[in-house]
Amino acid sequence: MTISLSCDMMKDITEERHRENTMVKKFTTTQTIFTGWGALQENSAALSGLGKKPLVVTSAGTWKRMGAQLAEQLSGCFSAYAVCDCINSEPTDVMIAEGLAAYQKNGCDCLIGIGGGSPLDAMKAIAVGTTSSAPLASYMGKEIGGALPSMAAIPTTAGTGSEVTKFTIITDTKTDVKMLLKGEVLLPQLAIVDASLSESTPQSVTAATGLDALTHAIEAYTSKQAQPLTDALAVSAVKRIFSYLPAAY
């Protein structure tokens, strides 16, 4: 089936995008981002600037697959660190409470999230918990402010892009509601995006997170908040996903 647009329709679309692009837009993201094959090994020293003792937030599966590799990098940056590997694919307030308890018990002063979007989201929520005893549900619909512990995000999948966003989603186990928490303080200070870390990712996860990334790219391009900067990133992402996801899968 072929879909054609009339000249008038194309003109309307162009004019609408022009109006949107003349509006004042804001672009915020993580302060420092290292990307590329082997980025973690080459730039792991940057982690030492986070603090003295981090809590590593991850999943049991991720830590089992690459814990030895990650431990080598962490030991080169810190004299001690703690690990919370209780996060699964749907982080809940109960998991966040467990992570917060580990943070406090071990005297941690910063956070490192390693894994897919779930551990990175959980890291952000734990950071919020370190500054207040208020339940996470009380932050829904509000802009979170204040100073949080330093955070570094090390994604192992292409899915959510949580390492560069000011959002996190945590499930409230009492109401079964997915809570959206937001605030620029939730942006990590550091992101290390190392493609080599995705080599051991299961095939099904590679496919699912790749399509998730494609969805986010399309959403960004069609958003009313789109701007030339985000358009360039979105188009580049779509092209790369179509080129490389089939090969990676």
Regions found by a protein language model. Give the residues of each.
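Short, positively charged and aromatic/hydrophobic N-terminal segments
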Residues: 2, 9-13
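ATP/NTP phosphate-donor binding region
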Residues: 7, 22-110
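Short Gly/Thr/Asp-enriched flexible loops that form oxyanion-binding sites at enzyme active sites
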Residues: 100, 119-132, 164-165
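FAD-binding core of FAD-dependent oxidoreductases
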Residues: 112-124, 157-160
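A glycine/threonine-rich phosphate-anchoring loop and its flanking beta-alpha core
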Residues: 131-228
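Active-site segments that bind and position negatively charged phosphate/pyrophosphate groups
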Residues: 224-249
